């Protein structure tokens, strides 16, 4: 299975840099079996069935992009930092520009209330130890940081105050992600209430999406790719809700690839169980899904692990046809783009 098998041509004009307004006005490509329909997210009320269960990732994106100053003698230099994940040894793993000029022991000052020491430096990242912890760190980070927009958006415009709302789901509660679970960005409170009134169930899980979600696949044989690890949790109550839905014949539908990867990790033994820890599950064609019946997700990058995941769910040829339709019909791609609802089998 070659990396080139997951390539496709995407016109740059289809890369969304702002979301649809309102959120539910985004377009929705409904692919059920061999059928494709062009709909909108607001139509989900008539698409989902009573007894369906949506699995939502309730992680909260932190303002992980920081701009600071490194002082060496009389000289000052600007440093751009993106937090990646908490480090096992304490502090945060982070990417920095310019990384090569930073040295262990140096201090980067981000604001009057927030500084960090370079504790360790690797080839591609470093470990920072901040001078604040707990609630004091959260408050200082909120003041000094900016939303960590994906590279394909950040290359086209700078983050602004609108992203603080746009790049956060309406049910975000547990801070720790440095990228949004973007399929969930399409939901607003009225849509959630309308779905609940139709007896569609909701289960919340937590997967703190890491910066590794944007890393390219660098091997041609995709089966040898190693995934980045991300921390997640499926509580006992969440596992019980999902198991009850399966037992009752309902469909379990993760909203986003992060929710899907998490519940499949929690069902590695065959049945969904409470689970907590780091997952590096890599789903590509040939994978046997254990609890997932369908998936709502945005449109993904060429040659990405997420494109491999949806190909595992729907089949490679089917995904090629779906993405060809999306490009020909001007669907908007990636984090702020439109959505798809993928239902295998039909």
Curated annotation (Swiss-Prot):
- In short, the EC number is 2.4.99.17
Task: Specify the pathway.
Answer: tRNA modification; tRNA-queuosine biosynthesis
Q: Which SUPFAM superfamilies match?
A: QueA-like (SSF111337)
Q: List keywords of the entry alphabetically.
A: Cytoplasm, Queuosine biosynthesis, S-adenosyl-L-methionine, Transferase
**Molecular function GO terms recorded:** S-adenosylmethionine:tRNA ribosyltransferase-isomerase activity
Family according to the record: Belongs to the QueA family.
Known role: Transfers and isomerizes the ribose moiety from AdoMet to the 7-aminomethyl group of 7-deazaguanine (preQ1-tRNA) to give epoxyqueuosine (oQ-tRNA).
One GO CC annotation: cytoplasm
Show the PANTHER family listed in the entry.
S-ADENOSYLMETHIONINE:TRNA RIBOSYLTRANSFERASE-ISOMERASE (PTHR30307:SF0)
Q: What is its main location?
A: cytoplasm
The compartments listed are: Cytoplasm
Q: Biological process GO annotation list?
A: queuosine biosynthetic process; tRNA wobble guanine modification
Q: Which Pfam families match?
A: Queuosine_synth (PF02547)
The organism that produces this protein has a lineage beginning with:
Bacteria, Pseudomonadati, Pseudomonadota, Alphaproteobacteria, Rhodobacterales
Catalytic reaction equation(s): 7-aminomethyl-7-carbaguanosine(34) in tRNA + S-adenosyl-L-methionine = epoxyqueuosine(34) in tRNA + adenine + L-methionine + 2 H(+)
Q: Could you identify this protein by its name?
A: S-adenosylmethionine:tRNA ribosyltransferase-isomerase
Instruction: Look up keyword Nucleotidyltransferase and say if it applies.
Output: no
Per the record's keyword annotation, is Transmembrane helix included, yes or no? no
Subunit relationships: Monomer.
